[in-house]
C-alpha cells in the first residue's frame, strides 16, 4: 500500500476548488478566498486510512499549462470539480479535463478520477442524471460526490473517497462495463482460497473461514455472522455453499459483492495480507524477505518448515499412497505462477515404481532448493503462503543458517543436517550411475532415463549414529584445469574411475593432486563398474598404491548393475566422513567405526516410513 497520497483538484475557474480545501482545513466556510490554496499535508493520524495526504490546488490564473501538466503527473488521484449550477463547467469535464488528464497519463495506468459537484447548497436538484452517463463512459472515474463548501456537506467524505481511490482502487479489481471481477483479481483470490482451504476439499469450512477472518482482519466471525455470510451466498447462487462450507464460486461472489457495494477496502485488505501489490502481483518484499547468509555457512529448513511442507504434501496426496501423481503435483503447484519442478526433479530425488515423487523425495527436493538457492526457496514458500499459515513475519522464519564450518572443525562436531558431496571423474566413468544408485535405481531403471531429463544432482537421506541426515551428491563436469570454486566447495569428495577403462584413474589422480591434496576436505576413491573385468590403469601408481601414498581410504568398489536396488552403505560412509572431517584415516579404516556409524540405518528408514503411513491412517 502507498505510504502517502497526493490529491490534485482541477476544474474551471470559480467552481470552488480552493473553498473546498479551506473548508476541509478550517471546518468553516472562508470569508475571503484566495485565488489558490497552498499545498497542505494532512498527517496520517487524522486520516481514516492512517496515511499522510497531500492536497494540491490548481489555479489557471496563477499557474502555467506546464505546471498543471507536472502536477497531473505527480498526482495519485485527481478531483475534477464542477459547479452543479453551472452547465458549462459540467460540459468541460468531458470536453476538456478528462481528455487533458488522459493525454498526460499512460493508458495502462490511468490516474483515478473523482467527479466533484460543488455548490449543492445553491440548487434543489441533483446533477447525478447528467454525471452517471459520464461515469459509465470512463472507467477511470472511481466515484462522484456532490458537496457544498459553504455548509460543509460531504467535504470530509470527498477527500476520504479520494484517498480510497488511491489506496483501494477499483480499476485492478473490477470491470464496470462487464460488471464482473477482472481475471487478474480472480486469479489472486483463487490462490488465496486454495491456501486457506487447509484440507484441500474445495470448501472453506467454519474453522477455515475463521482462520481466514483472523488472518486478514484480526477478529473471528461469530457463528451467526458466519451463517449470515453463507445465507447471502445461498440466496444469490446455487453452488456457492456446499456441505455448509463456502465454495470457490461463493468466495469469489462475496468479493464481487463487496466491490459492487463500494467495499473495495475489504477485498484489498485480503489481497495485501496475502502479499499482493496494487497491480495484483506478489510484492518483492513478500516473496524475497531480507535474508543474509554469512560466509562459510549453509541454509537448511527448520523443524517447523518441515512440518508445514509435510502438511502441504498430506493435503495433496489424495490417494494416500505416500507419493504425488502428476495430477496431484500439478494441483499442489496451482498457487504458483509457473511450474517450479521440471522432469529432472524426478531424477534428483526418490520416486516410486511409477516414477512419482515420494514423500521422502518431496522433502528431499525442498531440502536441496534450500541448500543451493535459499532465495528461490523463500519465493516458493511465499507462493504456498508459509508466513500466513504458520503465522510468521516472513518465510525467513523457515530457514536455519548453520554456523561457520571452521567452528565445526574446531569443535569437532556439527549441528548440520545437509552435507554436500561433489562427484568428479572422467567422462563415462559412471558418475551418473553413482548418483542414481543413491536413489535406489539399478542399471535397468537408469537406462529408462531420457537424456534431456537427466539431473546433475541427487539427494536422499542416510542415517549416521541413528541421526537422519541429507546427503546431496553433485556430478561435476570433467575439466581438470578449470574447476570452479563451486565445483570444489563441498563437505566430501568422490573421485570416480571406471575399473574397466585403463585411462580412467589418471583423471582422478590429477584432480586430487591439483585441488584436494592439501585441502581438509575428505576424499574417497570410487572404483566404479566393479562387475566388469578390472583393467590395469595407465598411471605410475595403481589406485590402491595411490591411496596408500596419500593416506586415503582404499578404493571403494561400486556397481549399479544389480538385480535389486544398490546398497546405500557407501553413501552412509560418505555422510559420516562429511560429518566428521577431522577423523584420521586410521579411524576411517576401522570396521568397528563404520559398523557403529551405519547401525540401524535400515531400521530407521523403515520405521520413519511406517510412522508416516500410520499418521496418514489416523488422519
UniProtKB/Swiss-Prot annotation:
Q: Which residues bind Ca(2+) 2?
A: 317, 319, 321, 323, 328
- Domain EF-hand: start-end pairs: 184-219, 304-339
Claim: GTP-binding is one of the keywords in the record: yes
* Positions annotated to bind GTP 1: 14, 16-19, 59, 118-119, 121, 149-150
Annotated SUPFAM superfamilies: EF-hand (SSF47473), P-loop containing nucleoside triphosphate hydrolases (SSF52540)
Start and end residues of each Miro domain = 2-168, 416-580
Cytoplasmic face residues: 1-593
Q: Which residues bind Mg(2+) 2?
A: 427
Keywords from the named record: Calcium, GTP-binding, Hydrolase, Magnesium, Membrane, Metal-binding, Mitochondrion, Mitochondrion outer membrane, Nucleotide-binding, Repeat, Transmembrane, Transmembrane helix
**Any one of the GO BP annotations:** mitochondrion transport along microtubule
- Stretches that traverse the bilayer: 594-616
Which InterPro entries does this one have? EF-hand-dom_pair, EF_Hand_1_Ca_BS, EF_hand_assoc_1, EF_hand_assoc_2, EF_hand_dom, Miro, Miro-EF-hand_domain, MIRO_dom
Write out the residues that bind Mg(2+) 1. 18, 35, 57
User: So what EC number does this one have?
Assistant: 3.6.5.-
Write down the PROSITE patterns for this protein, in alphabetical order: EF_HAND_1, EF_HAND_2, MIRO
Pfam families, per database record: EF_assoc_1 (PF08355), EF_assoc_2 (PF08356), Ras (PF00071)
GO CC annotations, alphabetized: mitochondrial outer membrane; mitochondrion
Q: Where does Ca(2+) 1 bind?
A: 197, 199, 201, 208
The GO terms this record gives for MF are: calcium ion binding; GTP binding; GTPase activity
Q: List ligand-binding residues for GTP 2.
A: 427, 429-433, 447, 529, 531, 559-560
Membrane topology note: Single-pass type IV membrane protein
Describe the function of this protein.
Atypical mitochondrial nucleoside-triphosphatase (NTPase) involved in mitochondrial trafficking. Probably involved in control of anterograde transport of mitochondria and their subcellular distribution. Can hydrolyze GTP, ATP and UTP.
How the protein assembles, per its UniProt entry?
Homodimer.
Q: Which family does it belong to?
A: Belongs to the mitochondrial Rho GTPase family.
Classification via PANTHER family: EF-HAND CALCIUM-BINDING DOMAIN-CONTAINING PROTEIN 7
This one is known as Mitochondrial Rho GTPase 1-A
Q: Which organism is it from?
A: Danio rerio (Zebrafish)
Q: Which gene encodes it?
A: rhot1a
